[in-house]
Amino acid sequence: CLTVTMEQPTALYLRGFTGDTFTGTAWQALDAQTLAEQTDLLYWLHKEGFYPQTQLAAASRGLHRQEQTQTVLIENTSACSAYVYAPYALSALPQESALRTDSLESTQLPASGLRGVRQYRLTIPLAPEQTAAELLDALREQPETADAYLSAEGSYRAFVQEQDVKLPEQARAQLAPI
């Protein structure tokens, strides 16, 4: 169970574990060997301040915009504490996360400490859906302004398309008609 307190309450979907590969019965994170093969890319992305969890903030910085944010307090009263429960759009990585520049994580937001974290604050865009739409429009209109962001985002997108969301052939066949 999580208790969520927001400065300006709005609908918010929180996620803990995010799987990359579907085995047919469960989602799993990318294996260590695959991540190790991508060390240079992930280190470069993280060094540039590009994390999937903070893409909106990175795009906003790339366009030299100041986004409006709010603080969300998460109290983990009985859920698994191995991961930080966070929305898809963070303005900054929480201090309680074990994710660092040299981390080989791409989609996870592991909690720091042996037993994880039970309470933490997140900074999120005030209106993430509106912010995302505005940023996409601005990136289309003035791509030269955000070259560094677009380079990082393109590299990450290629990595995701190559590695993430792999489905077994049976699942792919079932989804094909959709």
Regions found by a protein language model. Name each.
Residues 1-178:
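Helix-boundary/low-complexity linker signature
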